Amino acid sequence: MAKKKAFTPLLYLASIVFLPWWISLSFNKSLKSWITNWWDTRQSETFLNDIQEKSILEQFIEVEELFLLDEMIKEYPETHLQKLRIGIQKETIQLIKLHNEDHIHTILHFSTNLICFVILSGYSILGNEELLILNSWVQEFLYNLSDTIKAFSILLLTDLCIGFHSPHGWELMIGSIYKDFGFAHNDQIISGLVSTFPVILDTIFKYWIFRYLNRVSPSLVVIYHSMND
């Protein structure tokens, strides 16, 4: 009975680790056809206007072509102009297809991650007893560590998260999450998050030391400040 009671939280922990992967794999396949059909039937007209105004001009017309376009039209015979129009039309259709696929990919990943979050939230609520057992194990493990090891672990964690070299790690992590949700890479948004998120974490961590650790384990705070200095 005791073994079964100890095995259940471990099984629950393993299911939490692998459940997001299974949800993503399952819903990606089931939602892709529905989202593709919805996008093709309801969004194609609006999207085409957007492509005509922005992406097509940006990708198909170079600065030099803007100056030479009139000369090309005057000098080329009608057959060459016809081939040119056909080629541009084919490339335009291909570009629209690629952009449609990018938008479908974004909607699909965002929907899948939202569903995954809802399911995991419900799963966590239903498994509240297992979470309490896992929490007690973690607290017992941390309680048995010496203050020196605790201070070293806190110092290592803070240096990784909010230290001098942490922005590079945050940039990779936020970029990966941003990509996982299906959004296109945006340097301005990622740079903004990288510059603000560690500062917020640093403030929260200092408040935690001031309010919690000073009350629970003053010796740990002394060791931490000694190692940090």
From Swiss-Prot:
Disulfide-bonded cysteines: none
Keywords: Antiport, Chloroplast, Hydrogen ion transport, Ion transport, Membrane, Plastid, Plastid inner membrane, Potassium, Potassium transport, Transmembrane, Transmembrane helix, Transport
Function of the protein: Contributes to K(+)/H(+) antiport activity by supporting proton efflux to control proton extrusion and homeostasis in chloroplasts in a light-dependent manner to modulate photosynthesis. Prevents excessive induction of non-photochemical quenching (NPQ) under continuous-light conditions. Indirectly promotes efficient inorganic carbon uptake into chloroplasts.
Catalytic reaction annotation: K(+)(in) + H(+)(out) = K(+)(out) + H(+)(in)
GO molecular function: antiporter activity; proton transmembrane transporter activity
InterPro entries named among the record's database cross-references: CemA (IPR004282)
The name this protein goes by in its record: Potassium/proton antiporter CemA
Family recorded in the similarity comment: Belongs to the CemA family.
Localization in the cell: Plastid, Chloroplast inner membrane
HAMAP family noted in UniProt: CemA_PxcA (MF_01308)
Gene Ontology CC terms, in alphabetical order: chloroplast inner membrane
